[in-house]
Regions:
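Exposed, low-structure sequence patches enriched in small/polar residues
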Residues: 3-308
């Protein structure tokens, strides 16, 4: 349908925070005037947009629960309607699911569908003792037509044995719409089971050793994976790590590859320098809470960040 595009778009928002006892209620409503936006099929349409976000939480000694709901409808706000993916974004709408940090638990991560989605997430944290914490999270994301986009069940337990040793472990279940998130027509829903564990050992006041391991089981995409990491830290300046991601369950025996990485980091007041060898598989890479699809890569990588 033809239309005359608007060269100006107007946005506004309303938010409130209500606290009473252990209860906390946050709501936010943002709206955008009509402008040209791309739909899921890459066709421009003249549409207004809105986002409704609700967060209800309750906490008391040793227990907390949080319920979140997010409704997004055509709130794609960019410098140009022809920009796609992470290009030209003016605002940021967080995904309606848990932000995972382990390599395999974050391999299939959902990106907010700005054209339209409904997301529901609930999380509980229980501390039966000072040294033990149990966390359970569930999230469900679907489209306007109730098509399943993403679903996750996550449970983790963490225990501090003494001043030196801390152990955590858990299990994740994910159902992921790869056709939608990675633009792969005809791809089936990816269904995974991922157990994981992490051990931190403080050698002394300055030195520590951290070990991660996880395993992903799936019959879709590239099959099963194993992941391992060893990290040695000398506070507050140095960090060294080696890791391997092994695609041992690939249906093609010739592609059951190892993806090695070795990194070193130097921290200085206001400065952080990292460098190392990276071999990564194509897929979603999450860094600092931002997830994006990256190509396969094999080579040296350096980064420098500075605060002024």
């Amino acid at each position: 349908k033809r239309f005359v595009p608007k060269y100006n778009a107007y946005v506004g928002s309303f938010f409130q925070n209500l606290q009473w006892g252990g209860w906390d209620l946050n709501t936010e409503w943002a709206f955008k005037s009509r402008e040209a936006v791309l739909d899921r099929n890459g066709i421009l349409e003249n549409s207004s947009g809105l986002v409704l976000y609700t967060d209800l939480g309750y906490s008391t000694d040793g227990f907390g629960i949080n319920l979140q709901h997010k409704h997004t409808d055509h709130f794609d706000f960019r410098v140009s309607p022809l920009e796609i993916l992470n290009q030209g974004l003016i605002n940021y709408i967080p995904p309606g699911a848990r932000m995972n940090t382990y390599r395999l638990t974050s391999r299939y991560a959902p990106a907010t569908q700005l054209v339209g989605e409904d997301a529901l997430q609930i999380e509980t944290v229980f501390s039966p003792s000072r040294n033990t914490q149990i966390q359970v999270n569930a999230s469900h994301v679907q489209g306007p037509d109730r098509e399943l986009y993403y679903q996750e069940w996550y449970a983790e337990a963490k225990h501090k044995f003494n001043k030196q040793i801390t152990l955590s472990g858990g299990l994740q279940r994910v159902i992921y719409n790869q056709q939608l998130y990675e633009f792969k027509p005809g791809a089936p829903l990816v269904k995974t089971w991922t157990p994981f564990a992490e051990l931190t050992y403080k050698i002394n006041r300055r030195e520590s050793l951290r070990i991660e391991c996880s395993q992903m089981s799936t019959d879709q995409d590239l099959g099963d994976w194993l992941w391992g990491l060893v990290e040695y830290n000398i506070a507050p300046r140095y960090s060294f790590s080696i890791m391997d991601m092994w695609n041992y369950g690939n249906k093609n025996p010739d592609k059951r590859n190892h993806y090695y990485t070795a990194f070193a980091a130097l921290n200085w007041p206001g400065l952080r320098l990292t460098g190392g060898y990276v071999r990564q598989v194509q897929g979603i890479i999450c860094t600092g809470g931002v997830c994006r699809v990256e190509p396969a890569f094999n080579g040296l990588r350096f980064s420098l960040s500075a605060n002024f």
